[in-house]
Amino acid sequence: MFFYFIKNNDLRVKKIKEELSPIRNLFNSTLKNQLSRYLKGKQKNFSCKINFLNGTDLQKKVWAQLQKISYGKTISYSHLALKTSYQKAIRAVATAVGKNPIGIIVPCHRVIAKDGRLGGYAWGIKMKAKLLDIEVSGMADSIYRGGK
């Protein structure tokens, strides 16, 4: 729980509400159950609808595209840039991926470098490798186990 002490500043209160809106009511019992099942490799999709109110147009477009990456699949940063019509702004797209406020549910862990390296991850490379391992656990030998 967060407490904000604001004196005579309705605009700041509105901004805080906008910042928290994508995750404000997200963690209900259904989603907690779905996350638990996902971490056990038994849940592939999440039933929650996310509307990002906060973020640049580029970020919102990238985050929307992240939600289209299928379970168990990966995409390169450059291919993601192409899919979002920002093919000449790969670094900006990668930065938008890194600013994703809702990991796992908006699966930024599925974005990797063009050469197959994992690239970065806000919650750490080991976590990214683990999430990808969960999703590809049916494969005999996952390339992600080493945290490359």
Language model feature labels by segment:
Residues L82:
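Alpha-helical residues within the helix-turn-helix
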Residues C48-G55:
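Short amphipathic alpha-helical boundary/capping segments
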Residues M1-S47, K114-A122, K126-K148:
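Low-complexity, small/basic-enriched stretches
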Residues G55, Q59-W63, I90:
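Short, leucine-enriched amphipathic alpha-helices that occur as contiguous helical runs
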